[in-house]
Amino acid sequence: MMKQFKEFAVRGNVVDMAVGIIVGGAFGKLVNTLVSDVMMPPLGFLTGGVDFTNLYFVLSEGSTPGPYAALEQARAAGAVTVNYGLFINAMISFIIMAFAVYLLVRGINSLRRKEEAAPPPSTKQCPFCLSTVPLKATRCPACTSGLEK
């Protein structure tokens, strides 16, 4: 049984999939950091200092009555909140991730693309004078020899 498991585990597809999952997880963290630490602060600055992580509304107050200055305070008080700012961050991360995957797949497909088949020839060579003649010709225009179809 261990031998079968070893054969399964070291098969190319399983190892490739494991590497893909690990690299994908790291790439996801990289994109999330890009969005939350690089893109959202300037976007917040351009929108008047809005911090998207603190965009939420309270459905039910917690043990400490609101209003809450930040989402962390609302969570600490046990308030029930809808965190649409975090959703905006996640949506932007998803769009960037999807676009990156699209570019990756597009690049791989262009590398794998097979050359298009050459169109069928429209001419042939006369066996007597070696002139180029149309494929459907029955007589060579240069030497007037009869040609086979």
Swiss-Prot record:
Protein name per UniProt: Large-conductance mechanosensitive channel
UniProt subcellular location: Cell inner membrane
Disulfide bonds: none
Source organism of this protein record: Chlorobium phaeovibrioides (strain DSM 265 / 1930)
Gene Ontology, cellular component aspect: plasma membrane
Subunit structure, interactors included: Homopentamer.
SUPFAM superfamilies registered for this protein in UniProt: Gated mechanosensitive channel (SSF81330)
Transmembrane segments: 14-34, 85-105
Function in brief: Channel that opens in response to stretch forces in the membrane lipid bilayer. May participate in the regulation of osmotic pressure changes within the cell.
Keywords: Cell inner membrane, Cell membrane, Ion channel, Ion transport, Membrane, Transmembrane, Transmembrane helix, Transport
Pfam families: MscL
Membrane topology qualifier: Multi-pass membrane protein
Family: Belongs to the MscL family.
Molecular functions per Gene Ontology: mechanosensitive monoatomic ion channel activity
